[in-house]
């Protein structure tokens, strides 16, 4: 069986490699993507990118395609799946005064909407989006935990699941 290495570039912090077979990628595209978008879906899986391919024009389609691709790609390893709806938790990084370019939030959103990257790889990359201590990652995990318990964080105030001092400007010594 031939394997296709998939390199997922994580900004300037390096990359990670995951192995999916060409056959599995093709099978997932055939099962989950419309015929006219299968090549685009294959590209999504090969390069670990978010769902696009025109599916974003309908608010429900990306979720269906994402879930289907995850189910096919990680059918034998359910722990590698991650809930697309948890991407709303990336908002915890949005007001970080230490990240004016919103790099952590953007990385989080891209990774959380990329169906071919396994959960552990995504979470490790989100956690390490800053070379310094990423205190907001704890809030991100708390948000995911609350969502798993059925609580929609969209109706919560930030302070209800995260310490507001985490977003305040911090001084760094020796950096």
From Swiss-Prot:
One of its GO terms (biological process) is male sex determination. One of its GO terms (cellular component) is extracellular region. Disulfide bonds: none annotated. The keyword Glycoprotein applies. Gene3D superfamilies: 1.10.150.360, Caenorhabditis elegans Her-1, C-terminal domain (1.10.150.370). It comes from the Eukaryota. Its main location: secreted. Keywords: Developmental protein, Glycoprotein, Secreted, Signal. It is found in: Secreted. The keyword Electron transport does not apply. It holds the Pfam family Caenor_Her-1. One of its GO terms (molecular function) is signaling receptor binding. Residues 1-18 form the signal peptide. PANTHER family: PROTEIN HER-1. Dictates male development. Probably plays a direct role in cell signaling during C.elegans sex determination. Inhibits the function of tra-2a. This is Protein her-1. It comes from Caenorhabditis elegans.
């Amino acid at each position: 069986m031939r394997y296709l290495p998939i390199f997922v570039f994580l900004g300037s912090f390096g990359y990670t490699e995951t192995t999916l077979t060409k056959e599995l990628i093709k099978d997932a595209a055939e099962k989950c993507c419309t015929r006219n978008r299968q090549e685009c879906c294959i590209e999504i899986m090969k390069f670990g990118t978010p769902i696009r391919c025109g599916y974003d024009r309908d608010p429900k389609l990306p979720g269906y395609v994402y879930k289907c691709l995850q189910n096919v790609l990680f059918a034998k390893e359910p722990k590698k799946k991650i809930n697309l709806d948890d991407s709303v938790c990336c908002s915890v990084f949005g007001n970080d005064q230490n990240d004016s370019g919103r790099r952590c939030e953007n990385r989080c959103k891209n990774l959380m909407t990329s169906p071919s990257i396994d959960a552990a790889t995504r979470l490790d990359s989100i956690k390490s989006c800053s070379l310094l201590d990423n205190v907001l990652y704890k809030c991100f995990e708390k948000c995911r935990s609350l969502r798993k318990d059925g609580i929609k964080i969209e109706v919560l105030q930030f302070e209800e699941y995260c310490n507001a001092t985490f977003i305040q400007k911090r001084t760094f010594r020796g950096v």
